[in-house]
Amino acid sequence: QGVLKAGQLGHGTPIGSHYTPDAPGYVDMTAVNAHDPERARALLKEAGVKLPLSLSLTVPPPPYARQAAQVVMAQLAKVGIQCRVQQVEWAQWLEGTYRNHDYDLSIISHVEPLDLGNFTKPDYYWGYRSPRFDALYRQLVTAVNEKERLDLLAQVQKLLAEDCVLAWLYQPHWVSVARKSLAGLWDDMPMLVNDLRSMRWVS
């Protein structure tokens, strides 16, 4: 909630896997890796991590990333992880973080819809490799029965959460402000654009 408040002024829904709450088949996975500093310290000890651990947190220009980074840095410090926030421009983020995988931590909003296929690409910038996920995803994209597809979606979300591939934070709510006489605005935004063809002024 602290990250959501800092990054989006509270306008968002916490998520625990790589799927949005408004999509068919969504399963709430926020409890799988809930905020728990005590458990985090125990896991670090179990993994044999020597504290304090120093990491860099690379963030692109948008305010959601740079403001949230301060909260993430403070929260990690409580479990013995010292973060140095590195603010970069988009070109640097794309070249260093995305293309060359040169980063410890980063904060980014994934806006591409239904991009679960990226988890089948071991060379993608988060470097996830899972034969089990690959098999589930192949079944998912070829499923024709809706019940089977929803069941596979649930399994995929659960596996990603349990594997801790990413630390999912929230699905942002994009707030639009318009005159009362403007009709045709989308109630839900499948992408970050406004379809001007559907808009019109009404009396």
Q: Across the structure, where does each feature detected by a protein language model lie?
A:
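Detector for C-terminal structural segments
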Residues: 1-27, 63-73, 94-203
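DNA breakage-rejoining catalytic core of tyrosine-based enzymes
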Residues: 29-35
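Short glycine-rich hinge loops at helix-strand junctions in the catalytic core
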Residues: 80
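Short, well-ordered beta-strand elements
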Residues: 51-61, 83-86, 104
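Acidic/histidine-enriched alpha-helical segments
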Residues: 55-56, 84-98, 174
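Immediate post-signal peptide segment of exported/extracytoplasmic ligand-binding proteins
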Residues: 37-56
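Structural motif corresponding to alpha-helix initiation and N-cap regions
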Residues: 37, 90-91, 154
